[in-house]
Amino acid sequence: MRRPLCAALLAAAVLALAAGAPAAARGGAGGRSREHRDARYEIEEWEMVVGAGPAVHTFTIRCLGPRGIERVAHIANLSRLLDGYIAVHVDVARTSGLRDTMFFLPRAAVDNASAADIPDTPAVQSHPGLFGAAFSWSYLQTRHLVDYDLVPSRPLQDWYFSQARAESNAARPPPAPRVTPTPAGRVAAFDINDVLASGPEHFFVPVRADRKRRERHVADFAAVWPVSYIPAGRAVLSCERAAARLAVGLGFLSVSVTSRDLLPLEFMVAPADANVRMITAFNGGGAFPPPGPAAGPQRRAYVIGYGNSRLDSHMYLTMREVASYANEPADFRAHLTAAHREAFLMLREAAAARRGPSAGPAPNAAYHAYRVAARLGLALSALTEGALADGYVLAEELVDLDYHLKLLSRVLLGAGLGCAANGRVRARTIAQLAVPRELRPDAFIPEPAGAALESVVARGRKLRAVYAFSGPDAPLAARLLAHGVVSDLYDAFLRGELTWGPPMRHALFFAVAASAFPADAQALELARDVTRKCTAMCTAGHATAAALDLEEVYAHVGGGAGGDAGFELLDAFSPCMASFRLDLLEEAHVLDVLSAVPARAALDAWLEAQPAAAAPNLSAAALGMLGRGGLFGPAHAAALAPELFAAPCGGWGAGAAVAIVPVAPNASYVITRAHPRRGLTYTLQGIDVANPLLVTFVRGTSCVSASGAVEARRLAVPGPLDACAYCGSVFVRYLPSGAVMDIVLIADKRTEVEFSRGANSSMPVFNPRLHSGRSRAMLLFPNGTVVSVLAFAGHEAPTFSPAYVWASVGGALVAGTTIYAIAKMLCSSVPLARGYSSVPVF
């Protein structure tokens, strides 16, 4: 291997020293050391044998190194020796008649050496390594270094596959031009406080590539010789069962996906003229590039995986499609949009599979996982290329890339690779923003008086930057800002003024993300209140509408209906995805969604062209995406309601949970279909026996189990100036069928006043006249008391169809006429007694 480093120069000095010594007699078996000592350097010379067995070509390499190393410097021990030594292999031309030589140099001897300035080094360069010589291919055939099942071996067309048909560039919107920053925004370094205070569009960072710094990429599958490149970015997404690694450099990209459950895949992009070499026994010898399509005008893509057109057609098609991404325009936002599209389809497959949190990935979701990982790598590469070409990167671009990378990485790990909630995401982009532990007060804009909803969008953009550059332990200032965003959305929801457009959905997601995984008691209380309000906004009606929204997105994104330009996962985000409602997959909700499909003309027309089972399957998958398996998993629930999982008796133990309602510190209500093991349980009366409802109050780590009765008494009506008697209580509306319709928090005095007004309330959720006459309601107090709300407890009014009424009236008239005729006939057939008058006397 020819290395442009000082180690090669030192090795040349050692070679000159060895060349000046008397030549030793050649011969003898490999491993028999031949000493040639030097008083100054204590150098040993020996021969290393490569290959073994009569059927394998055996050859020797002349080695020079410190005294004593010859006893362990065998070919099988090279990887262990590299920790303490630098191995330099000098590969000379076969025609020169000179032998190859390997030098072992102690790393301590070159600690202070600087890299040699060798001009005209390619940005991407392959290093064939010790076994690059032609005679070593027979050794590789022993499968000592590579498992050839990772790549197709024959026939040739499975190795050099053609590109998949990519979307026409004419169908894509042209990339938006990069904003030219003003000189005033040029800073050498800034942190997130500056971005929050003045906006990310006002800052940019000058960037350049350090061409003296190089790294060597070693493929996970040991199928490609190490590639030297100039690094510019890196990301690692990993958990205990899978990992995705992204390495970005000047003109270079590598994306590898490894998993205990899925087939491996590595996607590489290099300049079209780069000489990337494969380690393989294909055709018995020679240097071949990795599998992939023909080179494009500027770059070439390689895909290393398992599968061909006969063994695994789905994997083969995935490899072809991933390879086609390399020739698309270098627009990082376009790649991110495509990644969101694939991530949505991946979430849909995972929701349809209904697997547990540690059951592994859904089979059909894996093919989308490869595509998402490739798109993330290309987005990081595209931004890097554009920034280096222009000499700067905008803070807005860094925020965009980092928040998309973090969001899509979590989805990729959970839904695509089957990871539990403890997955890790580590990234290093071309420029980083420092993240201080505390945010300055001036980082937040004041809320305009009387314009809370308008400021929600602006505050949501600030929380987006917090999400991009903060870890799971967001600063307290960010949590307070997030709590205010959710509170304003909740107030608008209670007034019936909230419209769920994309800006509101994005703001809600970033607020929930900033509140998740609290680190102390104050943060926990803020997070529980955020979740209570998300649960309240997830009414049965909203869940139905949100499921229909997801079905329409699937019809556009996955069904070929078009219209998915600029799509993001957060465009379909719903408060149900961050709520404690766990009943959205029940049959009643699925039927509600199916019955509401005709109201969406485009969706109804698309489903008409699908098989009969498509509608119920799509509805069930959409409701599954709304549940806890989407963007926030079971770990989120465990962090916000620890009292349900921390008891020594083994948790609360209820089956078929409907909802969790935190009401006080270390206390929660759990609505279930079955009797739990602990807590104070209320069984609601008048509910369908096949779909019962039980309300259990669970406090702390208590394992006591008891039963209580729902109180049916008239609630006091507090005056507008009285203390808030019902603040912190939760209003629950349900039906005799067992369906829970609303779970609403009474958070302040104004909400309490509207609740007390009953049928005169201006808040639709509290007005019984605006709901079915069959509705029932109860109030859950923070102290564990459950009271029936009498305003919703009136007798059920019978309803009759007009035809039934007219038929009943006609029947009554006929019956009355018949009875009258019979009575008259009976009266005429019975003789009547006649009276006699006195006889006159004549």
UniProtKB/Swiss-Prot annotation:
Keywords: Fusion of virus membrane with host cell membrane, Fusion of virus membrane with host membrane, Glycoprotein, Host cell membrane, Host endosome, Host membrane, Membrane, Sialic acid, Signal, Transmembrane, Transmembrane helix, Viral envelope protein, Viral penetration into host cytoplasm, Virion, Virus entry into host cell. Pfam families: Herpes_glycoH_C (PF17488). Glycans are attached at N77, N112, N617, N666, N760, N783. Residues 1-20 form the signal peptide. The keyword Membrane applies. Its main location: virion. InterPro entries: Herpes_gH, Herpes_glycoH_C, Herpes_glycoH_C_sf. It is found in: Virion membrane; Host cell membrane; Host endosome membrane. Residues 824-842 are intravirion. N-glycosylated, O-glycosylated, and sialylated. The keyword Signal applies. This is Envelope glycoprotein H. The lineage of its organism: Viruses, Duplodnaviria, Heunggongvirae, Peploviricota, Herviviricetes.
